[in-house]
Amino acid sequence: MCIRDRLDGDRLILQINEVTTGPKETKRPEVHRKYIDVQYMVHGHEYIGFYPDQKTSMVKEDRLAEDDVLFYEENDRVNEMMLPMTDGCYAIFFPEDVHRPCCQMGEAEDVKKIVLKVRVDTL
C-alpha cells in the first residue's frame, strides 16, 4: 500500500509506504534527479543499499520524466554499502546517491515507512 500526497504544490511529496522486504537481488537500484528522499522507518527492519552515482551503470528503466526515478541494472563493479534501518531510523538520499530500499534483514517482513521527497531547487 502506498499513500501519496503533494504538499506545497510539488515542492514536497509525502508517501506512506507499507511494503514487504525481499532479497537484495530482487530490488532495483534507483536514483532521483529532482527530489531528495528522506526515508523514515516507522516499523520494521530493512537494509537500504547505496552507492555514489557515477553514471556508469546501465539504465534498466527511465521514468525520470513521469516519476523522477531512474532504475539501474545490477552492477558488480560498484561498492554498494548496506544501511540497516530499524524503528525510528531515517536516511537521506540526494540526487547523486543511488539507493536500493526494501532489502530484507534475515527473513522477509512487512515494513511501514514514511518518505518525504523534497524538491532540490527549494533548498
Can you annotate each of these PLM segments?
Residues C103-E107:
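Short proline/glycine-enriched turn/loop segments at secondary-structure junctions
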Residues P84-C102:
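Conserved metal-binding segment of the jelly-roll/cupin
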Residues Y90-I92, A108-L123:
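A short hydrophobic beta-strand segment most commonly corresponding to one strand
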Residues R33-E46, P52-Q54, R63-E74, K117-V118:
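Short, conserved beta-strand element in jelly-roll/cupin
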Residues L14-H32, V42-M58, P95:
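Conserved short histidine dyad/triad with adjacent acidic residue
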Residues D8-G9, E25-I36, T56-L64, V78, ...:
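A short beta-loop-beta micro-motif enriched in histidine and acidic residues
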Residues M1-I3:
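Short, small-residue-biased leader/transition segments that mark boundaries at the very start
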Residues Q15-K34, A65-N79, R100:
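Short acidic (Asp/Glu) patches
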